[in-house]
C-alpha cells in the first residue's frame, strides 16, 4: 500500500495530463 505522498510523487513523473482540453504540466500544482 502506498502512502498519499508516494502516490502524489508517482503522479509527478513527467507524464502529460490533459484536463478539460488543457495540458496540465504539473499535476500537483494544478
Curated annotation (Swiss-Prot):
Any coiled-coil regions, as ranges: none
Q: Which cofactor does it need?
A: FAD
Q: Does the keyword Flavoprotein apply?
A: yes
The EC number(s) this enzyme carries: 1.14.13.130
| Keyword Flavoprotein in record | yes
Report which reactions are catalysed by this protein. Answer: pyrrole-2-carboxylate + NADH + O2 + H(+) = 5-hydroxypyrrole-2-carboxylate + NAD(+) + H2O
Going by the UniProt record, its keywords in alphabetical order are:
FAD, Flavoprotein, Monooxygenase, NAD, Oxidoreductase
Task: Tell me a Gene Ontology molecular-function term this record carries.
Answer: oxidoreductase activity, acting on the CH-CH group of donors
Membrane-crossing residues? none
Matching entries from Gene3D superfamilies are given as: 4-hydroxybutyryl-coa dehydratase, domain 1
Relate the assembly described in the record: Homotrimer.
Q: What does this protein do?
A: Monooxygenase that initiates the degradation of pyrrole-2-carboxylate, which allows Arthrobacter sp. strain Py1 to grow on pyrrole-2-carboxylate as sole carbon, nitrogen, and energy source. To a lesser extent, can also use pyrrole, pyrrole-2-aldehyde, and indole-2-carboxylate as substrate.
The name on file for this protein is Pyrrole-2-carboxylate oxygenase
Query: Which organism encodes this protein?
Result: Arthrobacter sp. (strain Py1)
Amino acid at each position: 500500500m502506498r502512502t498519499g505522498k508516494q502516490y502524489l510523487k508517482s503522479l509527478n513523473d513527467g507524464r502529460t495530463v490533459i484536463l478539460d482540453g488543457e495540458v496540465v504540466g504539473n499535476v500537483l500544482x494544478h
